[in-house]
């Protein structure tokens, strides 16, 4: 039977909901990078993140500023960054 090594990253919001969504996204990605690298070093093949891992869960109000958190797939900022890191690690990432 083949062995599959999986990992899960879950963390609290970095920053504050008064910040712009792109700033929150950048802080959250920055906070995840060491864990991605650690998972790769441990041979993780499938790495899962929590839902909406780059923003507050769910947007904390009806403020239109949260519309800016939406990203295009597959050419959005987060997708491109994750492809770069995951490609180096030869792993797979589940983005929800």
Where are these regions (language model features)?
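Hydrophobic structural segments
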Residues: 1-96
């Amino acid at each position: 039977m083949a062995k599959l090594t999986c990992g899960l990253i879950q963390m609290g919001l970095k920053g504050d909901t008064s910040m712009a969504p792109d700033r929150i996204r950048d802080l959250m990605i920055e906070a995840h990078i060491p864990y991605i690298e650690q998972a790769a070093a441990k041979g993780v093949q499938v790495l899962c993140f929590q839902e909406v891992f780059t923003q507050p869960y769910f947007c904390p109000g009806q403020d239109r500023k949260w519309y800016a958190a939406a990203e295009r797939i597959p050419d959005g900022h987060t997708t491109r960054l994750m492809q770069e890191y995951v490609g180096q690690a030869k792993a797979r990432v589940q983005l929800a």
